[in-house]
């Protein structure tokens, strides 16, 4: 087999791998394993006797040296300690530029499971003495029936949800709700609606995760059949997911002048770039928008074209990865109005690297993505056109409520038929509750996943 044939075979295999599992930072079958978990002391002792760490760490180095985007920042192979555990070893190879690569258990060791969520998602806060959580949205029908709603302040104790209010002396309980099952599944489309605003039909969809595109198909079909004029896409609680699903949604939304054009182009390290060039004549890879079939194709290939001229996207500082890729990929072809908070800032992607012999699989950053104009997402995130905070002090009306602050801005702009970019929506349209000052968020919200 010639060098060119071998290169072509490798590119085909890489593309097969990427088409099935490439996501913006994770694989959805892993939902509870810590990326920092290491072997027990007994397992470490046994592994060192068998030389498992040395062998696996050398495998880790070889894979990273081939696929890692910042491979030139890795330490020299002769300077590495191959006797350390694989997770620690993997971390020792990462570039200072890298905030996203991680390792996790290989599915050959832990098996697979459906991606699940709890009955509600929340953000924790503290003033240094009092800790509480604010409900962001509720997915459990049982908890909704029991009265739990967005904006509630809660504390969790022994599978009980304590509802309360903040007083001068801290959190004061007012009611108790028995907890729901911690493993209730939910569709990734949290809510979809159509509003009649003046003479326009305005679609709204709150989308939680770029997972199975089947969750989107019926909603997009409904929007297509109703011939919506505008779309408000709520991605403020969406940390990312599959690139294929991101393309599917973007392709449905985009105006017809984007059909056949570049959805995404990706750059790689020097080794992968050379292999792609030898196989295809280009160091980059390209992914294109296709022409929608509007339900007339084979089952499973349905793509409904909404052919919109603009889209309103609601964001938070935790709108990341695939959420950002959707925004940046649409910008060359239509008006994208971003409302909320500046996004997370992840313009890179990865694929999983595994070997069934070893306990851990790798999820290193392997590429940088760009839109058709070679624009990408910087580490600062995507700036907003209308700033509205989504933190503790902002009124938490139900998602989809036309008076909910971020949605209200979008609907008001549609009514006005005039956009003033770079505005500060807080000064005129956003309601704030009177709350105690001095509370700070604890960590990331519960819906966050490392994609």
List each model region and its residues.
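Small side chains
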Residues: 25-26, 203
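C-terminal "post-core" interaction segments
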Residues: 217-218, 223, 228-230, 239-451
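Sec-dependent signal peptide hydrophobic core
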Residues: 17-25
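Flexible, low-complexity junctional segments that flank or bridge functional domains
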Residues: 34-232, 237-239, 245, 252-255, ...
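C-terminal motif of bacterial Sec signal peptides marking the signal peptidase cleavage site
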Residues: 29-32
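Residue-level signal for secondary-structure boundary elements
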Residues: 25, 68, 72, 418-422
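Residue-level recognition of alpha-helix boundary/capping or hinge positions
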Residues: 3, 111, 120, 177, ...
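N-terminal secretory signal peptides that target proteins for export/translocation
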Residues: 1-15
């Amino acid at each position: 087999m010639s060098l060119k044939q071998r290169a072509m075979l490798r590119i085909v295999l890489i593309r097969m791998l990427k088409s099935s599992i490439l996501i913006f930072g994770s694989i959805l079958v892993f939902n509870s394993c810590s990326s920092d978990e290491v072997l027990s002391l007994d397992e470490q002792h046994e592994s060192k006797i068998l030389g498992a760490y040395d062998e696996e760490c050398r495998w880790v180095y070889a894979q990273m040296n081939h696929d890692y985007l910042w491979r030139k920042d890795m330490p020299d192979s002769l300077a590495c300690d191959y006797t350390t555990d694989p997770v620690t070893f993997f971390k020792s190879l990462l570039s200072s530029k890298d905030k996203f690569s991680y390792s996790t258990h290989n599915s050959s060791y832990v098996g697979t499971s459906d991606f699940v969520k709890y009955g509600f998602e929340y953000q924790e806060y503290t003033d240094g003495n009092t800790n509480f959580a604010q409900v962001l949205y509720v997915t459990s029908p049982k908890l909704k029936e029991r009265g739990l709603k967005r904006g509630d302040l809660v504390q969790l104790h022994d599978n009980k949800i304590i509802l309360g209010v903040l007083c001068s002396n801290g959190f004061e309980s007012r009611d108790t709700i028995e907890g729901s099952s911690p493993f209730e599944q939910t569709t990734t489309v949290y809510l979809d609606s159509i509003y009649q605003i003046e003479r326009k039909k305005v679609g709204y969809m709150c989308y939680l995760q770029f997972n199975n595109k089947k969750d989107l198909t019926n909603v997009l079909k409904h929007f297509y059949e109703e011939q919506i004029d505008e779309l408000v896409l709520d991605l403020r609680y969406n940390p990312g997911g599959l690139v294929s699903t991101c393309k599917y949604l973007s392709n449905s939304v985009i105006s017809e002048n984007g059909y056949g054009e570049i959805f995404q182009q990706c750059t790689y390290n020097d080794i992968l770039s050379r292999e792609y060039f030898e196989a295809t004549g280009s160091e980059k890879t390209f992914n294109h928008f296709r022409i929608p079939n509007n339900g007339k194709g084979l089952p499973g290939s349905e793509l409904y074209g909404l052919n919109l001229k603009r889209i309103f996207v609601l964001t938070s500082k935790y709108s990341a990865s695939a959420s950002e890729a959707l925004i940046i990929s649409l910008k060359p072809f239509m008006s994208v109005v971003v409302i909320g908070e500046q996004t997370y800032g992840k313009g890179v992607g990865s694929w999983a690297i595994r070997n069934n012999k070893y306990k851990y699989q790798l999820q290193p950053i392997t590429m940088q993505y760009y839109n058709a104009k070679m624009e990408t997402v910087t580490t600062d995130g995507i700036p907003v056109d209308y700033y509205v905070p989504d933190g503790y002090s902002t009124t938490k009306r139900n998602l989809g409520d036309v008076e909910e602050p971020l949605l209200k801005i979008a609907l008001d702009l549609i009514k006005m038929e005039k956009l003033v970019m770079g505005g500060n929506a807080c000064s005129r349209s956003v309601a704030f509750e009177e709350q105690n000052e001095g509370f700070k968020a604890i960590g990331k919200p519960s819906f966050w996943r490392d994609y």
